[in-house]
Curated annotation (Swiss-Prot):
Family annotation (SUPFAM superfamilies): C-terminal domain of alpha and beta subunits of F1 ATP synthase, N-terminal domain of alpha and beta subunits of F1 ATP synthase, P-loop containing nucleoside triphosphate hydrolases
Protein name: ATP synthase subunit alpha
Protein's organism: Clostridium kluyveri (strain ATCC 8527 / DSM 555 / NBRC 12016 / NCIMB 10680 / K1)
E.C. designation(s): 7.1.2.2
Subunit details: F-type ATPases have 2 components, CF(1) - the catalytic core - and CF(0) - the membrane proton channel. CF(1) has five subunits: alpha(3), beta(3), gamma(1), delta(1), epsilon(1). CF(0) has three main subunits: a(1), b(2) and c(9-12). The alpha and beta chains form an alternating ring which encloses part of the gamma chain. CF(1) is attached to CF(0) by a central stalk formed by the gamma and epsilon chains, while a peripheral stalk is formed by the delta and b chains.
Record-listed ATP binding positions: 169-176
Domain of life, per lineage: Bacteria
Site feature location: Required for activity: 362
Length: 504
């Protein structure tokens, strides 16, 4: 066999040319303790706060405690199969969630992974879950209304786009029902809705999703679910993940509504996590930064300036109280962060007043700025009328003789209370609200028996739809009641009353 030296030389030369010298450096550490979804890792000297760490079995964790000799982190998945001595790698990234148009209509978990059985979500963009809230210069005043479709709220506690309005009350008082009705009412209004379920039963979340599908509200809604069976870290990041998804649309100039249901369970999850991380407990065993936990989340709700596209993120956080105690630690924290609260009372709920809104304690700090002029015209005296009625009603129960004016105030109050009742999943268009509140506040329903008020309301709105559609259209278009329109509306009410009372 004849070996040519040139051939050997050329082979060696080509091999040398192809040789690539690569050194891959990995910053890794060792697990020294693991349990209850919390791990302590030795090493990782360059680790960032909130950094994503890679554990064995494709499980990730979030670094929260950066201590002198170890890093305390919370697992964002199952700790099964992970043991002390395993290697942990840094990723150099913070926790991110997928964002984009394709997430609309889907049910996802805290990490943005689909859990509705409809396959993977094709989206290329991601966004960090923890982001700094928009600054003062980047915002503008809240003045555009976000209609909830609930008469009592739109008339007395109006919500504006970019506002943070707390829904607070005991369990089973209709807090989630108000949030659901508000989402359903955004149909056709070009508002993207996000519902974040924190620590809820999976059956409850399934029921909510089914209702959203039945009312076609899922077409513009994202559901982020961190159910009660999920670990505390996943419940902790759920609202931030939902907020990041909403901010993506807000930055594109769109209007977004986000519901956090509920932040009481969120605080409990954070408390469990903090105690396991051995952070010092404070009042009610919550950590010292529990106020910051919610303030940094709710401050991300904003109405951006026109220069930045004019998008908005409206937040409806929900807080569950115990025996109506709004002076507890978490309720007072969130009340002080938000721009007002809708307070729901158990007594009102069981007396048949639904939604069970206590108009005396409930308030919107944006107020009339977030109302159309027509609503201001008809609902201006509503809160005072109801306050006078409540005061007189408590006085009248002692059987005192009342003068004519007091009796009239009582009768009007009874009718206003009936008018403000509303069944669930039946949000009302703003022009219909204006028409029925016009009839109530201007004393046109004083001769209708109290027990027939709801029947009167339903038939009156049907009558207006059939015979005087132009009145509703004008209110919707011009958003103000002119003298001419007021006369038309008055005549239509008198016309209908004759028919209604004859039939009755």
């Amino acid at each position: 066999m004849n070996v040519k030296p040139e051939e050997i030389t050329s082979i060696i030369k080509s091999q040398i040319e192809k040789y690539e010298k690569k050194i891959e450096t990995v910053d890794s550490g060792t697990i020294i303790q693991i349990g209850d979804g919390i791990a302590r890792v030795y090493g990782l000297n360059g680790c960032m706060a909130g950094e994503l760490l890679e554990f064995p079995n494709d499980v990730y964790a979030m670094a929260l405690n950066l201590e002198q000799d170890n890093v305390g982190c919370v697992l964002l998945g199952s700790q099964e199969g992970i043991k002390e001595g395993n290697t942990v790698k840094r990723t150099g990234k913070v926790v991110e969630v997928p964002v984009g148009e394709n997430i609309i209509g889907r049910v996802v978990n805290s990490l943005g992974h689909p859990i509705d059985g409809k396959g993977a979500i094709s989206t290329t963009e991601t966004r960090a879950v923890e982001l700094v809230a928009p600054g003062v210069i980047t915002r503008q005043a809240v003045k555009q209304p976000l209609q909830t479709g609930i008469k009592a709220i739109d008339a007395m506690i109006p919500i504006g786009r970019g506002q943070r309005e707390l829904i607070i009350g005991d369990r089973q008082t209709g807090k989630t029902a108000i949030a659901m009705d508000t989402i359903i009412n955004q149909k056709g209004k070009d508002v993207i809705c996000i519902y974040v379920a924190i620590g809820q039963k999976q059956s409850t979340v399934a029921h909510i999703v089914n209702n959203l599908i039945e009312t076609n509200a899922m077409d513009y809604t994202i559901v982020v679910s961190a159910a009660a069976s999920e670990s505390a870290p996943l419940q902790y990041i759920a609202p931030y993940a939902g907020c990041s998804m909403g901010e993506y649309f807000m930055n594109k100039g769109k209007d977004v509504l986000i519901v956090y249901d509920d932040l009481s369970k969120h605080a409990v999850a954070y408390r469990a996590m903090s105690l396991l991380l051995r952070r010092p407990p404070r009042r009610e065993a919550y950590p010292g930064d529990v106020f910051y936990l919610h303030s940094r989340l709710l401050e991300r709700a904003a109405k951006l300036s026109d220069k930045l596209g004019g998008g908005s993120l409206t937040a409806l956080p929900i807080i569950e109280t115990l025996a109506g105690d709004v002076t507890a630690y978490i309720p007072t924290n969130v009340i002080s962060i938000t721009d007002g609260q809708i307070f729901l009372e158990t007594e009102l709920f069981y007396s048949g007043q639904r939604p069970a809104i206590n108009a005396g304690i409930s308030v919107s700090r944006v107020g009339g700025n977030a109302q159309i002029k027509a609503m201001k015209q008809v609902a201006g005296t509503l809160r005072i009328d109801l306050a006078q009625y409540r005061e007189l009603a408590s006085f009248a129960q002692f059987g005192s003789d009342l003068d004519k004016e007091s009796k009239r105030t009582l009768e009007k109050g009874k009718r206003l209370t009936e008018i403000l009742k509303q069944p669930q999943y039946k949000p009302m268009a703003v022009e219909k609200q204006v028409m029925i509140l016009f009839a109530a506040s201007r004393n046109y329903i004083m001769d209708i028996p109290v027990e027939r008020i709801s029947e009167f309301e339903e038939e009156f709105l049907d009558y207006m739809d059939t015979h005087h559609r132009e009145i509703g259209d004008e209110i919707k278009e011009k958003q103000v009641i002119s003298d001419e329109l007021s006369d038309k509306l008055r005549n239509a009410i008198e016309e209908f009353k004759k028919i209604f009372l004859i039939e009755g």
